[in-house]
């Protein structure tokens, strides 16, 4: 299935990809087709959590 997600900031793809692999490493998850949906989902959930944290800090001026 093709990925149809459009990035709001196209230059952010590399940074998000790097974040994905850093988080996977922290969690001990080997990303790929052999990983469970739960393991891959935990990485995606943590990415979302960290991006929300970053946005809140920027909006709050911290």
From Swiss-Prot:
GO biological process: DNA topological change; sporulation resulting in formation of a cellular spore
DNA-binding among keywords: yes
UniProt site positions, description: Cleavage: 22-23
InterPro entries for the chain: SASP_alpha/beta-type, SASP_alpha/beta-type_CS, SASP_DNA-binding, SASP_sf_alpha/beta
Molecular function terms, GO-annotated: double-stranded DNA binding
Region forming the signal peptide: none
Gene3D superfamilies, per database record: Small, acid-soluble spore protein, alpha/beta type-like
Keywords, sorted A to Z: DNA-binding, Sporulation
Pfam families (alphabetical): SASP
Keyword Cell inner membrane included in the entry's annotation: no
Function comment: SASP are bound to spore DNA. They are double-stranded DNA-binding proteins that cause DNA to change to an a-like conformation. They protect the DNA backbone from chemical and enzymatic cleavage and are thus involved in dormant spore's high resistance to UV light.
Family per record: Belongs to the alpha/beta-type SASP family.
Additional notes on this entry: SASP are degraded in the first minutes of spore germination and provide amino acids for both new protein synthesis and metabolism.
The protein's name in its UniProt record: Small, acid-soluble spore protein A
């Amino acid at each position: 299935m093709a990925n149809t997600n459009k990035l709001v900031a196209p230059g952010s793809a590399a940074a998000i990809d790097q974040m994905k692999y850093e988080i996977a490493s922290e969690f001990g998850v080997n990303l790929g087709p052999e990983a469970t949906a739960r393991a891959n989902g935990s990485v995606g959930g943590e990415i979302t959590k960290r991006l929300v944290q970053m946005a809140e800090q920027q909006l709050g001026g911290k």
